[in-house]
Every structure is written in C-alpha cells, then in structure tokens.
Amino acid sequence: MRPTLDSYTHLAGGKVRDLYTIDDEHLLLVASDRISAYDHVLSTPIPDKGRVLTAMSVFFFNVLGGTNHLAGEPDDDRIPEEVLGRALVVRSLDMVPVECVVRGFLTGSGLVDYNNTGAVCGVALPEGLVEASRLPDPIFTPASKAALGDHDENISFDQVVEKVGQKLAVQLREDTLDVYARASNFAADRGIILADTKLEFGLDSGGNLVLADEVLTPDSSRYWPLEGYEAGKVQPSFDKQFVRDWLTSPESGWDRSSDTTPPPLPQEIVDATRARYIEAYERISGLSFDDWVGPSA
C-alpha cells in the first residue's frame, strides 16, 4: 500500500511545487496544477499541468544522463496515490542559491536589459539585435533566487563568483551551457526552438554538483515552433502564453500595474493552455501523454 501525502512532513512550498520529507536522504517533489503569471499564483489550476512538468523533467533527465537528483522511478512505491504522476522521489541536496539561466535567443528580460545597456547580465552583445534574434553564441545569464512573489534579479557572473566562489561558478556556467547545447539540438531535430531555459543545481554530501528541480519544462523554458520563426516579432510559445495574453487583454478587466489579484481564468483559456503543455511534451518527447503514469484530469 502506498503512503498518504499527510504521512510526510511538508518542508517547503513555491509557486508551483511542494517539497516533503521522506527520510534523512530523500524528499518528495510534488508539481501542482497551479499556474503563475506576472508574479501571481492564479486561482484557476490547469488540469494535468503538474503531470506534464513531471513527465518532461523525467524525459530530459534520461536524455541528458549524467548526475541528477532522481532517486526513484515515476511509479516509486514511496509516492502517494493522490500525487502519482506529478511527484518524484529525489535526493536531498544543498541547493546552490543561483538560478542558472542560459539564452540562445534574445527575448523577455534579456531584451529589456540589452535595449538599456547593450548587454545581458554584463555579457556584451552585438549592435542591431531585435526581439527573438538568435545570439552569436548561447550566453550564461544567472539570476538570484527571489522570495515568493518577488522577481528573480539578473546578476553578473562576477556576482555568482561572490556568492559561491570561482570554481563552482565556472562549473555552473559550463554545465548550464552544456545542457542547453544538447537540449537545443535535440529540440531542433523535432522542429522546436529552445530559446532559453533555467536550471537549478545542488551539491550532494560529497560536494558533487547535481542537476536538480525541474529541467527543460514549459515552465522553466521558452519553446518556440521552428516553422514560422522570424526575428523581429514575438514568437508563439509552448507555455502559458494564452494565460498571459488573456490577463493583459480588455476581456479580463485586470490591471497588471495594480495590486489586485488576477481574476479566475475562463474555461477556454484553461483548455487551450492544458492542450499547449501536452503538445509541448508530445512533440519534443515523441511519446503519448496518455501513457504517462497517474490519473488524467
């Protein structure tokens, strides 16, 4: 018989994930169906989102190989029935206090930084780049981890060195760029552009650097269709684009600059977002989401 979730101690919770203690060496990482936008956790969940994020992470952990935090299969007996398919047994690590972001294309906060300074996180870039420009080479653009509700703050490589030391900072940069190079080639072969992604690492008891948290999911990455790609315009993406677009439209009646809570999402936006997440998983993995462990919503 599987344990119940309340038999584990709740250790921490974020915008999307919750962490529970299994024993001294293992944790239960649970991905919820919560969705966040513009630093708000919305009141309307996206059915199956937690399962998609978990399936995508497991897929890419297997593709990448190497050292990661997984400590059990997706149907591990230690996973409670109520979170089966959206929870993983992972090793307990000393997490590195840096968001390891890598960008192969210019968009989002990177574009804002570039337009203001000609650089992103202190990395100088050529003149004349526009929205969605491919960068000459992928760049490591780290961020400090923010508290729930706050923005992650872009930092320079020198600031990473100040936080964790030269040796670990260099290893973080090298490992992040390596993951991006392999994952972007993998995605490109499937007609998908991996514009950027955010990784997290931890240290095990032996001081070894371990890839952790989620990896290459639609929440932590920008995926664009290769077909129709054109620099100079905003690209359609395989994530919560429908949610962001609706929240900033007149239909929502919500003012992003206000301190008010965003309204509930209409059913058609929920359905479209769920379908987009599943499409991302199936196109990139080549697998059917129907075959993933756990009950479908």
Swiss-Prot record:
GO terms for molecular function: ATP binding; phosphoribosylaminoimidazolesuccinocarboxamide synthase activity. The keyword Ligase applies. One of its GO terms (biological process) is 'de novo' IMP biosynthetic process. SUPFAM superfamilies: SAICAR synthase-like. It is an enzyme of class 6 (ligase). PROSITE patterns: SAICAR_SYNTHETASE_1, SAICAR_SYNTHETASE_2. It catalyses: 5-amino-1-(5-phospho-D-ribosyl)imidazole-4-carboxylate + L-aspartate + ATP = (2S)-2-[5-amino-1-(5-phospho-beta-D-ribosyl)imidazole-4-carboxamido]succinate + ADP + phosphate + 2 H(+). Pathway: Purine metabolism; IMP biosynthesis via de novo pathway; 5-amino-1-(5-phospho-D-ribosyl)imidazole-4-carboxamide from 5-amino-1-(5-phospho-D-ribosyl)imidazole-4-carboxylate: step 1/2. InterPro entries: SAICAR_synt/ADE2_N, SAICAR_synth, SAICAR_synthetase_CS. GO terms for cellular component: cytoplasm. Its EC number is 6.3.2.6. It holds the Pfam family SAICAR_synt. Keywords: ATP-binding, Ligase, Nucleotide-binding, Purine biosynthesis. HAMAP family: SAICAR_synth. Belongs to the SAICAR synthetase family. This is Phosphoribosylaminoimidazole-succinocarboxamide synthase. It comes from Rhodococcus erythropolis (strain PR4 / NBRC 100887).
